[in-house]
Amino acid sequence: MDNLQTLFDHLYQGKPLTREQMAQVFSTIIQGDMQPATMAGMLVALKMRGETIDEIAGAADALRQAAKPFPRSDASKQSGIVDIVGTGGDGHNTINISTTAAFVAAAAGAKVAKHGNRSVSSKSGSSDLLSHCGIALTMAPDAASQCLDKLGLCFLFAPHYHGGVKHAVPVRQALKTRTIFNVLGPLINPASPEFMLLGVYTLELIEPIAQVLHALGVKRAMVVYGSGLDEVALHDNTHVAELKDGVVRTYQLSPEDLGVNRADIAQLTGGEPADNALITQAILQGKGLPAHRDAVAINAGCALYISGICDSVQAGTQLALATLASGTAFTLLTDLAAASQAGEHNE
């Protein structure tokens, strides 16, 4: 164990920390043992230099190790599970594309454990939307695991599993700037998914985050930046860093590559959680606007590809479109709402 002050001095001098040293620093944060001023200085020092892959992985290690355990069945370990998640912070108040896509991917055969939170930077985060769809956020881990096995989908509410992160909230709010915490959320899913479709808020992050996912043991992933969006874009090209067989390759995908027509980003503008819940329900019933349907389908399609359900993103998108037309994804939403109410865990 290194002396913490020595580690802080390293950071203030612009020197990187090892993965193990960073895990030690973040363990101190989530135990509530770091002074706010020290935490602020550390977060800003990291931001000014730029976090390394080892530092991000080490911070994620600490948070994952401290999380409330999520029990995985043998069946889910054999099939593998996928998360569809974004860092947020892209500045566009769109409809809840990744959350809606999670229902579609699950209805099409993937096992989806979506890790989400209430909104920080937009009007409606995934958990805000789910509440309005009648889905209880505080399911006991055992009940959520059963939903994953029986329905192919569960939602894991971040504060329910990561209680220690609350110690950083006042400092993050006071700093009013992005810090390493903005990229940690998608990396600390307590279900430890083997596959990930992860959207980021800037192009510069796609390759480093793909390398972090590899370091954390993720088998296959697409880290995407959709021309201003933290998801696969319908309005323009999407930059992709794909992790497969331990190798990261980068490329671009256009909406046309995915088999859909591009649409202006204004067509994806969302509203308050109640509005977005109605939009999601319409999409899942096969009654959504064409741009809404296609935006959800291309994201669900990429998730179906990386989880091995489909051999290409194009095939995944076609399966997602067929699933939306069938209405089975809406049935899944109602089934999950009923199961979540039964499995709610009040603390």
From Swiss-Prot:
The keyword Amino-acid biosynthesis applies. Mg(2+) 1 binds at S98, E231. Keywords: Amino-acid biosynthesis, Aromatic amino acid biosynthesis, Glycosyltransferase, Magnesium, Metal-binding, Transferase, Tryptophan biosynthesis. Binds 2 magnesium ions per monomer. Signal peptide: none annotated. GO terms for cellular component: cytosol. 5-phospho-alpha-D-ribose 1-diphosphate binds at residues 86, 89-90, 94, 96-99, 114-122, 126. InterPro entries: Anthranilate_Pribosyl_Tfrase, Glycosyl_Trfase_fam3, Glycosyl_Trfase_fam3_N_dom, Glycosyl_Trfase_fam3_N_dom_sf, Nuc_phospho_transferase. Disulfide bonds: none annotated. One of its GO terms (molecular function) is anthranilate phosphoribosyltransferase activity. Mg(2+) 2 binds at D230, E231. It catalyses: N-(5-phospho-beta-D-ribosyl)anthranilate + diphosphate = 5-phospho-alpha-D-ribose 1-diphosphate + anthranilate. Anthranilate 1 binds at G86, N117. GO terms for biological process: L-tryptophan biosynthetic process. Its cofactor is Mg(2+). Its EC number is 2.4.2.18. Pathway: Amino-acid biosynthesis; L-tryptophan biosynthesis; L-tryptophan from chorismate: step 2/5. The keyword Transferase applies. Homodimer. Catalyzes the transfer of the phosphoribosyl group of 5-phosphorylribose-1-pyrophosphate (PRPP) to anthranilate to yield N-(5'-phosphoribosyl)-anthranilate (PRA). Belongs to the anthranilate phosphoribosyltransferase family. This is Anthranilate phosphoribosyltransferase.
